[in-house]
Amino acid sequence: MKKLFRKLTCALLLASLMLSLSGCSVLKEILAEPTEGRNDGKYIKTSNELTYPDHVASYDEVHPKHKPGNLKGSDAVARLNEVESTILKHVISCYVDADILFENPEKVGITNADPKTAWGDATTPASKYPEKKAFYEKQRDLLLEIDYETLTGDDRLAFDKILYDVEEEIYCYSYTAFEYYTMIFNSLVGPQSEVLFLLDVFTFDTLKDAENYILVLKDIDRYYDQMCEYEETRAKYGFASSPESYEAAAATFDDLCKQKDDCFLYQSFEERLDKIKGLSSSDRERLIKENEDAMKNVVFPEFEECAKRMRKLKEAGGQDAGLSEYRGGDAYLEMLNRNQTNSGKTVDESIKKLDQEITNLQKERSQLSKRSSEWKSEYNSHRYSKGTVTQNLDYLRDAIKKDFPKVPAHEYYLMDVPKVFESSFSPAAYLGFHLDNFDSNVIIVNNRNVDSDFGVTVAHEGYPGHMHQSLYTRSHTKHVYMYVCGSTGYKEGWATYCENYSMRYFSGNGMTDAVRYCQIDNDWTLLLSTRVDYGIHTEGWTLEECVSYLNAHGMFVTKSSFKRFYTLLVTDPCYYVKYGMGYVWTSNVMNNMRTQFPKATDMQIHTAYLDSLTCTFEQIEDNMKKTLK
């Protein structure tokens, strides 16, 4: 599968023939080859060179029950560690990932990352699918030799998580069409939207670090060529996006190219050189020149090339369509839903749960509105913030002590959003890099977008949200896999739950009706957006139908105002689903535990949840029951 983009949380949260642009051979190939397949009006025609599922696989097909193996005790643990190490080396195989994820990658066995091919491979060509599938089948078979019942503690949790993920990978690599359903260069969330910011994250402790960084810059040429080739191959197979989407992608590269002469990375590079102890003036001068040369003669020319290649694809005559309009799209969505939501629930089960949650919110909002109006004054004047990001972090760190478990001693530092990103970046974000060092935590701050509810944003990103969870997980397991390969649905579900929970700390009166109404407001937009995401990909909702649905639920949007987000949801399936359903399933686990264990305190429930690590929500709930009983 392709690495859609490297998430700035950096715990997430991924050699083909290069096609020349010297002529029009690429476009001729795209337009000349007919897209075979079903032409009954039900599906968009796509190539029969690819393989497609003939049905939607059930959970039991992907995750069948297994008999216990024969390896017990220390032999079982050794086998688990062996498989984990093998998978980590397979997943973290490039310099960029290794350098960002770990301060000392060699200590976790990552020694094969070459800075000359720093970004690794952007995609997995269909021809490599059998090899990938065989790799994961071998790891599964090795795991199944373990007698699961003899494992204890985080070994048992790691076994559950790794086996689940391995079986998902086996299914994922069973059908080559799965590689091509989605666009890489999405204009809103594609890798080009954050590449400059990501480059600013690299730190230099030694001369070699700076020299390797320049190799990272030079490798952008090869890496982005791979992604362009992917888009061209995707169009060749009949999955071309709309001319509007390709133009929007090209425009993002145009915007990058405008920074060629005064990009913030020039100054940032020089400032990072200041951190290298004993750097000679001659080496400093050389590195500055090499950095500028790589930026102006490799990076920005590559972005110009990408813009040209995306505009060329406009002639392929594609369209933006939901997954339900493609052969095998329903099976792909089912797999994607499990992966992104961190749950084994089906798409239908997820939609049913989501619709019920939306109905419940609607009823609760109506009931609150009919109550005494005293709370409305608090709601209208609320200010859920203590000031700056530091003031909010200091306040929350103390306020949450009675409800959330301790995390290890650690440090964090603040990083201002570069001015070029201020208009589009959220008020704050957590960046956990060098996950083998508790002191490597960054809170990225965008002072331009700070609002009166900044405190709950800080709760989402810091305490008790992303930073708190990351620190706790890393300090409560010896299995690196559990914090490197955690699902986005798990992480965002926890952080959004914490965002809502933390409103009570700012109200001055604890959990009030006004606080609850603010929580409903928070949930409302997220869950409706999630429902639209499902509607597009399961029921083929058009732009008009999405706008109609949102307006029927009081959102007051127009076709023109929603068009950009509609395109995002069509071209990036499950974009909102991973956030919305991650939150729904997290809250569902918490509510179930409070119902089943009414004497348990929130501290006990939150601790049991975090102690269950980054397993699926079903696995987490099972483990919590054993802990809380």
Label the predicted regions.
Residues 30, 34-629:
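N-terminal maturation segment of proteins
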Residues 25-28:
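Bacterial signal peptide processing site
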